[in-house]
């Protein structure tokens, strides 16, 4: 290392090994600018603290990665480490504008030129920057001493418990009050008025016990009410589950009549059955008229598909295809 040479460091992305010659080309380029590469480390070694950098040692630090400019990823926590390892006015290359805020926060000055030589420079005096502690101008309550919380002299308001004897009484409405209210609205039904009169006529004590037998009328036990099959919401009357009026028998009779009509199958005579017969000459044939010629001439819905060719009027023999059956 000569007097005019400057010390440099290369931080290598692990994927650089996939691009042969990239590292050597970068070393040659930096050597032409009078930089001597004293160290080179993998970025993951620096990230997991396997390697530590000395403070104010390097004039240049270069982050070498094969990633595209818009896809570069870098651990942000290493930016202050790099700033500490650079000398004053030292340069850091390899990152983009995406990390601009982190660079400014950590005391870098951004240099952007037209020949894609984008880099950061460690500003003078950034290493001696001190944190300024802010103090509040106003004091709340007593002064805060020795980290204790402030105290307040004002007391919280107190409330007295309400006496049990001052409970509100229930307001009862008389029939006259209800009638006055109903007169104001002529559209109210008379049913509401009759209900009000009924409940007002009851003079039962709330604490008195009521015998349930007194609520049963003398006519309630005269007899059992028979449930008869009546009309339902459906259009047609249907029998109940335990029908005793004969409705269930009528429904069963109707179902039997329907089944009897369904059992009557339409009977065809022999002439009607042979009205369309492809095996009898002179009878009507299908639309294609080629049913007897074989599968090559038959329609897709022909009933003779798969059978051998035959002459009209000749009985069909399956002996020719017995080997296939």
Curated annotation (Swiss-Prot):
Binding site for [2Fe-2S] cluster: 229, 240, 243, 245
Cofactors demanded by this protein: [2Fe-2S] cluster; [4Fe-4S] cluster
GO cellular component: cytosolic [4Fe-4S] assembly targeting complex; mitochondrial intermembrane space
Compartment(s): Cytoplasm; Mitochondrion intermembrane space
Region (Linker): 170-222
Motif placement: Cx2C motif 2: 299-302
Principal location listed in the UniProt entry: cytoplasm
Cystine residue pairs: none
HAMAP family: Anamorsin
Biological role: Component of the cytosolic iron-sulfur (Fe-S) protein assembly (CIA) machinery required for the maturation of extramitochondrial Fe-S proteins. Part of an electron transfer chain functioning in an early step of cytosolic Fe-S biogenesis, facilitating the de novo assembly of a [4Fe-4S] cluster on the scaffold complex CFD1-NBP35. Electrons are transferred to DRE2 from NADPH via the FAD- and FMN-containing protein TAH18.
Homology family: Belongs to the anamorsin family.
Name of the protein in its database record: Fe-S cluster assembly protein DRE2
